[in-house]
Amino acid sequence: MPGRYCIWAIWLLMAVPLAAAPSQGDTAQQPPPSTTRGYTVFLGGAVVGREELTVLTTADGLDIIGKGRLSGSQDLVINRAEVRYRPDWTPEVYELEASVNGGDTLLYTSFAGTTAVTKGVDAGQQVAHTDTVPPQPVVLPNVFFGAYEALTRRLASGAPAQELNVFVGFGAQGSLRLLSTAAELVQIGTSTLNVRRYALAYAGPRGAATVHVYADDAGSLLRVSIPAQRIDIMRDDLAAATSRTVVYSNPTDEAVVIAGAGFNLGATLTWPASARGSGEAASAKAAATRLPAVVLLAGTAANERDGVVAGVPILGQLAGALADAGFIGVRYDKRGHGQSGGRAESASLGDHADDALAVVRWLSNRRDVDRERIALVGHNEGAWTALLAAARERRIAGVAAIAAPSATGSERVLEQQRHVLEQMKVAPAERVAKIELQERINTAVMTGRGWDSVPADLRKQADTPWFQSFLGFNPARALEDVRQPLLFIHGELDDEVPILHLDRLGELARKAGRSRSVAVVAVRGVNHLLVPASTGEVSEYASLKDRHVSAEVTSAIREWLTKTFAPGR
């Protein structure tokens, strides 16, 4: 028994998958008779292993063969693993040749009826064990993730069973209960892949977990994920930085890749419907009618291009609305996220401004874009990035700042914390202590002194280039260098960045006196997500019925852009 758990106990919760495939009731495509592919294993975002998998589909059934290595608390080398099924999904054989920290494991399990007989050696201990198993169990050894190929094939083969029995290994069995299925779209480079995601509840001898498995149209395994354990197993093409899950799309979206500062930015270009077409005629038309363009920038709560906050794809919806009004919209993944390269952990606000400028330059070089009519639209702290970029590049024709803070970064953090503590009804003494701690953290980040009074775990989170640049950012100072037309727009019910910031920004911009024009717009009945709300409080987000960006917001931006881009401005 101890020998068995030296392998299984370590990886038990690492063996449940995250799959994506078509919706229930669809008929899966026929998988190819033979495939070979690689998978990468992640733990907490770090690579901890790899598997090479060969899958054979014949008239005799399904044969899954693999090898690989997992590193962590134990060094597991899989020299060979095989799971073989008959056509009716009855398992026939499970074999494992592996070593754990140099100790050999050689196990052979044969299935007959309701009996599974395992013989061999497990970490140097002789094994001779018989298990009683239910009919047609799925064999999911915790050390061989490729075995989940059988699970995704079964789930995609028709109306999937609501509950499946699982054989983990000798003396260990469990069950999987199907919770939900969902169709998704994954973008790899500029191509897309239809996937189906299955959410399942796993119960076994060592505990329970919610797991997800993803499959392609043929039912082949794409990904296994256990969020609670921070475990992901992905097919290599999905594991690359060139892949992302598409959570929102407009009918005229086009995936593009933009060269940045030594890496590429994954982006989506949204066209006005009137500009779409193909062939030489469309290219000639685009070149003859250069269109105005808008670069959309997300705040700190969203890292990927659609700007999803609390389930609302803010930037994705803005891009669609502006395209309907005749503007090309570009949104992109922040560096180190989604399909964009670069290092997220070392990026400052200034670095994000550089990325925005890379997009502006890319647009300026296109034959279908009017380089004199390119504006930036930033939401929340994305507006700060837009201001920094506009100060550096006069070719930017204007900046629209949506729900932007007017305070310095340091003041903003303290304002947010006070608000959260008030909502939580924290005792006054505890509230004072937490605010004082945050003040010490802010001082240490900006000066490099005083870290001895800050807990080590908090220092690890706070002592970053991005947070340092955030705390030191001052909108008043940034506005002194911005000469382009400015639009400040805010929802009156914004609970995260209260409406008082709107008037302050307008005053700061007018006082700076550099901008050619300053427009200030307050939108009634709209919250921080730019959608209609009753109270605007964060606690209301989950119950919002209308999750579409307000037409009043998009109309105000459209009208300002039209005025800003007008000839003679």
Language-model-detected regions and their locations in the chain:
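Accessory cap/linker subdomain of secreted extracellular hydrolases
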Residues: 164, 398-481, 511
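Solvent-exposed helix/loop surface patches that form functional interfaces
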Residues: 32-34, 48, 101-195, 199-204, ...
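Short beta-strand/loop motif that positions the catalytic acidic residue
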Residues: 482, 488-490, 494
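Short beta-strand element of the alpha/beta-hydrolase
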Residues: 288-299
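N-terminal cap/lid segment of alpha/beta-hydrolase-fold proteins
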Residues: 241-279, 284-288
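Catalytic active-site module of serine/aspartate enzymes centered on a nucleophile-bearing elbow/loop
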Residues: 529, 535-569
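Alpha/beta-hydrolase active-site loop
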Residues: 314, 346-367
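Primarily recognizes the serine-hydrolase "nucleophile elbow" in alpha/beta-hydrolase
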Residues: 358-426
